[in-house]
UniProtKB/Swiss-Prot annotation:
It comes from Thiobacillus denitrificans (strain ATCC 25259 / T1). It comes from the Bacteria. Keywords: Cytoplasm, Elongation factor, GTP-binding, Nucleotide-binding, Protein biosynthesis. GTP binds at residues 17-24, 88-92, 142-145. InterPro entries: EFG_II, EFG_III, EFG_III/V, EFG_IV, EFG_V, EFG_V-like, EFTu-like_2, G_TR_CS. Belongs to the TRAFAC class translation factor GTPase superfamily. Classic translation factor GTPase family. EF-G/EF-2 subfamily. This is Elongation factor G. Its main location: cytoplasm. Residues 8-290 form the tr-type G domain. The gene is fusA. One of its GO terms (biological process) is ribosome disassembly. Gene3D superfamilies: 3.30.230.10, 3.30.70.240, Elongation Factor G (Translational Gtpase), domain 3, P-loop containing nucleotide triphosphate hydrolases, Translation factors. GO terms for molecular function: GTP binding; GTPase activity; guanosine tetraphosphate binding; translation elongation factor activity. It is found in: Cytoplasm.
Length: 696
């Protein structure tokens, strides 16, 4: 089967934004205009096509990023048909992991901002993730019809808060209830959409007289940004004072793909204005899979390799999401970087070292699906029948293994104990939790050794609440949930040398292991580092892995309160052995003893997770909010003003933030909102640490 759309006409984009910027509505409109959904789905009435889990429709927030394919020929049909694969990403900070994984497989992103709220905390997080993966971006300022809408304020915020280089390529005609359309600065024409056809039809008119000067000013800024793409274009611009349309588009495209500029557009998705023009810009300015550097990975021999985005290249793909589907079981969403794969093919997963057979391949449209026979470079699809694939795994040709760069997933910061309500739920709960953990790498499940309880960990209260809810709905498991607990850590502050000796001589073969270690603090976030500095075989080669294993085991339970120990550097520098009595077990036990004794002397401290908290509050409640954050041991980092709303930034220990949403609601009569994300671990004050240790 030949390719239906050339790869140059593919656009793999994400739509990403803060919670209420109107991202799902924007995606719905895209599906409507591209003819994939015949009736517009409104989030307000819980019918949005993209939000397909029951909970999303109830809560009106997007939890899983659904992938959808649609086709577009331009507002006036001027382009050959382009294929746009859209990944809708969640805006709630507890689901940052979803954003992170979709960023990894996108070629470009459309950042949706609310014209009133502007750049909000989650927007900054998403921006950082897009920077990390080098994703080119467009900005769409939505909700221009809302009171307080201000396109240029969002422009300033993008510069100040995101340190971005936004370039408006449209100017709004009016704002709030007077918002009528946009001026296209490339064509210098005003675009008005027709309400009766829900924006399917439009008119091009002259620019309203009161906007001519504004448009000239912003067009000049846009031309300068375009001209900076090359010396030759700059000279042409300086000589002629203007540039032809084709040159402007080509130059803006080159600079957007290089992540040097972020073209800005505006509209109101809800009122069917602006999304159509944004789609045109996705085609004109966003990269095709062939416009970005070839994907990099590691070959079987450990050397660096890459794969070109062509059908002739060997097959390679990245699994970026695992979802359980009520009809077909487990779906693995994957992005094909190179080559072709057919349903029924056997492929290789180098991360797990397993062969897998692809049963069926489905092209997704929100939660409707179409079965297809093959997928090619640039495609995003879902596979059924893969047995052991986790998010971030590579799928590739059996005869040309390559492991694509893996994704990094954050460590969970909050955990709760869950207990099945009945004996019958016990086994089902184990299966359900295993499934959910496979779908979501930021969710962990373990059994507490002391209490025998099942502990689940995640990125925040909402994250865990939704997972427990899914357990009930999708797997029919009723569970009791304990109070949330903070994931504390332990660390050391001093460098010490310590001996560890395990010797038992009781007739027959004894046990003998003896080590000297030097242990000290490692850089924050570096984790555990083991250095083998044995000279002259005082500890034989074959026992050194056992020493490291013992140390890693000892890290699981610190000496203060049994929390995991982080950021420690341990050097094994001396020891002794016995020809007959030494064994791996003896050296492992000696290492554990040395670590425990050494840690007691190395000024152990308790670390607690600190959260970056941003509160938006009307001025009247400012005093209460600040006072309350101080009481919660918060450190105020800064304050900002936005249209009569005060923005307070603080760093607060997670332990003090439980139940904050309820307290904030009552303190501000429901008018203040907040967002919070994990920042880093820091040393808990002495009084706090003592109280936690005493509880243990």
């Amino acid at each position: 089967m030949a390719r239906t759309t050339p790869i140059e006409r593919y656009r793999n984009i994400g739509i990403s934004a803060h919670i209420d910027a109107g991202k799902t509505t924007t995606t719905e409109r895209i599906l409507f205009y591209t003819g994939k959904s015949h009736k517009i789905g409104e989030v307000h009435d819980g019918a949005a096509t993209m939000d397909w889990m029951e909970q999303e429709q109830e809560r009106g927030i997007t939890i899983t990023s659904a992938a959808t394919t649609c086709f577009w020929k331009g507002m006036d049909g001027k382009f050959p048909e382009h294929r746009i694969n859209i990944i809708d990403t969640p805006g709630h900070v507890d689901f940052t992991i979803e954003v992170e994984r979709s960023m990894r497989v996108l070629d470009g992103a459309c950042m949706v901002y609310c014209a009133v709220g502007g750049v909000q905390p989650q927007s900054e997080t998403v921006w950082r993730q897009a920077n990390k993966y080098g994703v080119p971006r467009l900005a769409f300022v939505n909700k221009m019809d809302r009171s307080g809408a201000d396109f240029f304020k969002v422009y300033e915020q993008m510069r100040a808060r995101l340190k971005a280089n936004p370039v408006p390529i449209q100017v709004p005609i009016g704002a709030e209830d007077k918002f009528e359309g946009v001026v296209d600065l490339v064509k210098m024409k005003a675009i008005y959409w027709d309400d009766a056809s829900q924006g399917m039809k439009f008119d091009l008119r002259d620019i309203p007289a009161n906007l001519v000067d504004t448009c000239k000013k912003w067009r000049e800024a846009m031309l300068e940004a375009a001209a900076e793409s090359s010396e030759e274009l700059m000279n042409k611009y300086l000589e002629e004072g203007d540039l032809p349309e084709a040159d402007i588009i080509a130059a803006l495209r080159a600079r957007t793909i290089a992540s040097e500029i972020v073209p800005m557009m505006c509209g109101t998705a809800f009122k069917n204005k602006g999304v159509q023009a944004m789609l045109d810009k996705v085609i004109e300015l966003m990269p095709a899979p062939t416009d970005i550097p070839p994907v990099k990975g590691e070959l079987e021999n450990g050397e660096a390799g890459e794969r070109q985005a062509t059908d002739e290249e060997k097959f390679s793909a990245l699994a970026f999401k695992v979802a359980t589907d009520p009809y077909v079981g487990q779906l693995i969403f994957f992005r094909v970087y190179s080559g072709v794969v057919n349903s029924g093919d056997t492929i290789y997963n180098p991360v797990k070292g397993r062969k897998e057979r692809i049963g069926r391949i489905l092209q997704m449209h929100a939660n409707q699906r179409e079965e297809i026979k093959e997928v090619r470079a640039g495609d995003i699809a879902a596979a059924v029948g893969l047995k052991d694939v986790t998010t971030g795994d590579t799928l590739c040709d059996l005869n040309a293994p390559i492991t694509l760069e893996r994704m990094e997933f954050p460590e969970p910061v909050i955990h709760v104990a869950v207990e099945p309500k009945t004996k019958a739920d016990q086994e089902k709960m184990g299966i359900a939790l295993g499934r959910l953990a496979q779908e979501d790498p930021s969710f962990r499940v373990r059994t507490d050794e002391e209490s025998g309880q099942t502990i689940i960990s995640g990125m925040g209260e909402l994250h865990l609440e939704i997972l427990v809810d899914r357990m009930k709905r999708e797997f029919g498991v009723e569970a009791n949930v304990g109070a949330p607990q903070v994931a504390y850590r332990e660390a050391i502050r001093k460098e010490v040398e310590q001996e560890g000796k395990h010797a038992k001589q009781s007739g027959g073969k004894g046990q003998y292991g003896h080590v000297w270690i030097k242990m000290g603090p490692n850089e924050a976030g570096k984790g555990f580092e083991f250095i083998d500095a044995i000279k002259g075989g005082t500890v034989p080669r074959e026992f050194i892995p056992a020493v490291e294993k013992g140390l890693r085991e000892a890290l699981n339970n610190g000496v203060l309160a049994g929390f995991p120990v982080v950021d420690v550097k341990v050097t094994l520098f001396d020891g002794s052995y016995h020809d007959v009595d030494s064994s791996e077990l003896a050296f492992k036990l000696a290492a554990i003893l040395a670590f425990k004794d050494g840690m007691r002397k190395a000024s152990p401290v308790l670390l607690e997770p600190m959260m970056a908290v941003e509160v938006e509050t009307p001025e009247d409640y400012m005093g209460d909010v600040m006072g309350d954050l101080n009481r919660r041991r918060g450190i105020i980092q800064g304050m900002d003003d936005a249209a009569g709303i005060k923005l307070v930034k603080a760093e607060v220990p997670l332990a003090e933030m439980f139940g904050y949403s309820t307290d904030l609601r009552s303190m501000s009569q429901g008018r203040a909102t907040y967002s919070m994300e994990f920042k880093h671990y820091s040393e808990a004050p002495k009084s706090v640490a003592e109280a936690i240790i005493a509880k243990k």
